[in-house]
Amino acid sequence: MKKSARLRIDSKGKIYLDVFFEKTEKEKKIEGEIIGLDCGYKKLAIMSNGDTIGKELQAKIEKISRKVQKSKAFNRALIERNEYINKELKQLNLDTIKEIVIEDLNNVKHGTKGKIRKEFNNKLQRWVYCYFFNRLEQHCEVVGVQLHKVNPAYTSQTCFDCGDVHRSNRNGELFKCRSCGYTADADYNASLNILNRFRPQVHMVPVHKNQLEKCNIFL
């Protein structure tokens, strides 16, 4: 890996060390599992294989929202949030994963995730998605995992079990199909739809009991 460095001083007298390097992209995996991944408001991400990371995300976002924008405390909270996301990403076990399917952020609009209503919180959440997906993309490149994007339309309202689409199917963190009665964590159900949208020819069997236990859904 070729490296070079440059020391520079900005107009305010701050000193920066810029490090440049060329890296060789790791060969993509040809064997392994393909999973869907959905970002939530209370959880950073939940996967179609049942794994969940970032269960303290909501607390981090709410901490930022209480700070005065552009203040030192606000900036510290942002740094803390980013460090938390980086730490949680390291907990994501990709040893047996060859491909990850996520939503295309270009199609995500205000209020499509959870029940965030205030404009500032909407911005905070979009920042989280952008930062997380950028870091995830970098992480995948390092370990040779392919990343795919699909249209997110109605993934949170569609029943993975029977295909019924209706906004009443989702109530906060709980998904309960009005048509067939299928019940699951809402983000987990969305992760299955995301994966199925990438591989529509394969209809997987959702993990009912185990997934409800993993996501702490009490019915």
Predicted regions and their residues:
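Substrate-contacting helices/loops that form the catalytic groove of nucleic-acid
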Residues: 11-133, 201-219
